[in-house]
Amino acid sequence: MGKTANSPGSGARPDPVRSFNRWKKKHSHRQNKKKQLRKQLKKPEWQVERESISRLMQNYEKINVNEITRFSDFPLSKKTLKGLQEAQYRLVTEIQKQTIGLALQGKDVLGAAKTGSGKTLAFLVPVLEALYRLQWTSTDGLGVLIISPTRELAYQTFEVLRKVGKNHDFSAGLIIGGKDLKHEAERINNINILVCTPGRLLQHMDETVSFHATDLQMLVLDEADRILDMGFADTMNAVIENLPKKRQTLLFSATQTKSVKDLARLSLKNPEYVWVHEKAKYSTPATLEQNYIVCELQQKISVLYSFLRSHLKKKSIVFFSSCKEVQYLYRVFCRLRPGVSILALHGRQQQMRRMEVYNEFVRKRAAVLFATDIAARGLDFPAVNWVLQFDCPEDANTYIHRAGRTARYKEDGEALLILLPSEKAMVQQLLQKKVPVKEIKINPEKLIDVQKKLESILAQDQDLKERAQRCFVSYVRSVYLMKDKEVFDVSKLPIPEYALSLGLAVAPRVRFLQKMQKQPTKELVRSQADKVIEPRAPSLTNDEVEEFRAYFNEKMSILQKGGKRLEGTEHRQDNDTGNEEQEEEEDDEEEMEEKLAKAKGSQAPSLPNTSEAQKIKEVPTQFLDRDEEEEDADFLKVKRHNVFGLDLKDEKTLQKKEPSKSSIKKKMTKVAEAKKVMKRNFKVNKKITFTDEGELVQQWPQMQKSAIKDAEEDDDTGGINLHKAKERLQEEDKFDKEEYRKKIKAKHREKRLKEREARREANKRQAKAKDEEEAFLDWSDDDDDDDDGFDPSTLPDPDKYRSSEDSDSEDMENKISDTKKKQGMKKRSNSEVEDVGPTSHNRKKARWDTLEPLDTGLSLAEDEELVLHLLRSQS
């Protein structure tokens, strides 16, 4: 076999393309083998993620708080760090530095720090990392529960969570009041992180069947001291009962609770207490300047208006104690127009309106927000310059949270507290809480009085006047219900002056205030009576009894002049009835003591003249004079010690056996009372109106009177007898049907009369028109030569045609009368007049087209004149 041309022995060069293709094929085969080997050696993503999680968990114990300055110094997942960087969170605060590491290790944490120190991120970062470690998905259900006291704070927390955790695959939801419950119930099962308020959460636990929290991993209470307060106590107890005990719990607040009872409710296990600023000099931010002023209650509105006028380019929050105050003052200040935008935020607003106000105040650079304490906790409003506390807070903790809305995270801010002269004790409480407040004075030259303007506004607007009255009552009630009576004393408030400052002419009536004012006098009377009635010895002589009687009469007359009423009077107020019953029980006890003492053979020391007392008791009270009755009551009200040590249980049982007067009286039902009033035949006032023509205008339809007299009018039994009512209705139905038949007959008769009258009128009109009807024919202008008019001598002899026209004229008259009746007195046309001629008796069968016309040799006008002449001659 010979050698080829491309063989090496032939001396020819090898083909480079062929050799390159051969090399490329070998190289690609080698690379594919390497890729397959690399794929076999490569781990799946879930396994790599688990290994990274295990490495992070190993680094949790190595966290050194002193070395941490950034979030990247913590062993956090890449998704969390990326979310923090995108949200511009890089440096950590003190509370974040000390609590995030403990929370990552799975410990229960109680964190407390100043307002604006970053507590929200301190619990959101551990929340994201806890679910990331467990590889939590939407199908796993609820994993973390974050509870906030207010809707606005929950909304703010949810927005921060969206920014920080947007790179994770968790689902988060906001459950607050004011939203659609069904819409929330449809999506609540797929939520991993739930931010909510206590009330709506409990509602879903009770009403949403598929909602459960059995797999809950972490519970977070934001503003924990407020949530664990008495206001949320019942709700939180019910919520905690539905949560598993094996969970991690985080509590954060600016004023943290240390109550063992509250912490025991949450089932905390070895919690870590983190009080960042516990050893600090002040409990408020160092950049916050705090002052207070003292002014009278009637000057507070003028002070507020003057403050707003002098801070037009500032962003301020004004706190009030009640919603109705915010509602009234917001509307009034909008009418006063201080020169700055005013917003209102309170609990009585709809949820969507509250969100709009919150977002609008965040956007504005210069505005004033009138708010209640729902905005006092947790809300982070940017660049707030002033916090003005119009009403004194209930305690120092509330003041700290209110003032914390400004000076957020190393920014400057100012806080002003307005106190009444009776509320100066609050300053000492603030100093005890390490709150540095200084007193400043009001410049009277810059104070603008707005009382006259308010009076004029209320005089024009009735709705605003009613709001002012509700504002007045609401403020007085809030002061009255405050727990700290050393600071809040409603009796020291200048009530009439405060009403005038609101623009009201007269102070509204406050019922609870009137009752409160009566209580001191009763206590004084009771104390004086106790002092007077104290016995001097266990046994008394007759002379001593007489002296005591005169002394009692004198004292009781003085007390009665001061407002005390006698025992015999009825229908007292609630507080008076309690005192009266107590005094009557004491009298009965004394009488029982005397009877028991007689039974034992000993004489009662309180009544030496028992025969006289017995005679007095036997006389009916209605026959006694007023003086004797008072004297008897005064004497029997002598309070004695239980000398014999008798048991009072027997006395109370005897008192219970005696029937009271109220139980003896027969109860009067509403039906009996109504019948009793009807029997008296009271004449009710009636308003009678007339039209311009003098006709009576009936405002109400007449009441249908029963045709059957009720046989049991005097029956006082309550309720309705259905059987008798059914029989009564059946009898009434017969009369109703008869009345209906009469009405229908009268209606038909009236209709017939109207139709008959109409026919008569029509006949009269027809007869009148027939009498007045007259035909006018124009003269012909054909003969121009005859200027003198028509010549009667040219007419033919009328006697020639008289005999033949006698019968036809009668038929013609009948036809004309019939056509007039049918066509409404319409004039005949010229064609009908032309067709008049000798015809047969049967006009219907006659054929008009076969008849030959009568040729008189005259013109048309002359023929018409002839016909008219003939008709007149017949008549």
Curated annotation (Swiss-Prot):
- Where along this sequence does the record place binding of ATP? Y89, R90, L91, Q96, A113, K114, T115, G116, S117, G118, K119, T120
Q: Which Pfam families match?
A: CTE_SPB4 (PF13959), DEAD (PF00270), Helicase_C (PF00271)
Q: Which UniProt keywords apply?
A: Acetylation, ATP-binding, Cytoplasm, Helicase, Hydrolase, Isopeptide bond, Nucleotide-binding, Nucleus, Phosphoprotein, RNA-binding, Ubl conjugation
Single GO cellular component annotation?
cytoplasm
Q: Annotated cross-link Glycyl lysine isopeptide (Lys-Gly) (interchain with G-Cter in SUMO2) - which positions?
A: K649
Q: What is its EC number?
A: 3.6.4.13
Q: Where is the Helicase C-terminal domain?
A: 287-448
The residue ranges of the Helicase ATP-binding domain are 100-274
Give the catalysed reaction(s), semicolon-separated. Answer: ATP + H2O = ADP + phosphate + H(+)
Q: Where is this motif: Q motif?
A: 69-97
Compartment(s) of residence: Cytoplasm; Nucleus; Nucleus, Nucleolus
* Subunit structure, interactors included: Interacts with AIM2; this interaction promotes AIM2 stability. Interacts with SCNA; this interaction causes DDX10 mislocalization to the nucleoplasm and cytoplasmic inclusions.
Q: What does this protein do?
A: Putative ATP-dependent RNA helicase that plays various role in innate immunity or inflammation. Plays a role in the enhancement of AIM2-induced inflammasome activation by interacting with AIM2 and stabilizing its protein level. Negatively regulates viral infection by promoting interferon beta production and interferon stimulated genes/ISGs expression.
Which protein are we looking at?
Probable ATP-dependent RNA helicase DDX10
Instruction: Give the species this sequence originates from.
Output: Homo sapiens
- Species lineage: Eukaryota, Metazoa, Chordata, Craniata, Vertebrata
